[in-house]
């Protein structure tokens, strides 16, 4: 079975992320969403909270699995027999960065390719960073995030 992985910090998962997951789930029989533990990043939600928010957000997708990881992505890819890495690219800046990561991951995994998904137009401006900034300044993020994330933010 072809399995792909969509790694990210997802702090929090946005509707842009969810759109990419849903589109991937239509194309591939198995999509793994790997939530990264990034000690160098100051996250709003803990790893456990982020994993649970992603799980709740993709509960309607039967071929999507969610887990947290702290290891090198290349090692996770080998452990799960992954065929390709899914990455979202909004801008040319994203593309340049992702191109470098794709080359590195291809080297470290002995050939696993990265597949770049442009965002749906309505989500092209959305990022976790923007969502956090709006939230921290008291703005309404209801249209930008899945319902479980909005509820978790309201409860904070």
Curated annotation (Swiss-Prot):
GO CC term (a single one): cytoplasm
Catalytic activity: (R)-4'-phosphopantetheine + ATP + H(+) = 3'-dephospho-CoA + diphosphate
Location in the cell: Cytoplasm
Feature type site, description Transition state stabilizer: 17
Entry keyword Magnesium: yes
Pfam families xref list: CTP_transf_like
EC number in record: 2.7.7.3
Protein's name according to its UniProt entry: Phosphopantetheine adenylyltransferase
Organism, scientific name: Haemophilus influenzae (strain PittGG)
Gene: coaD
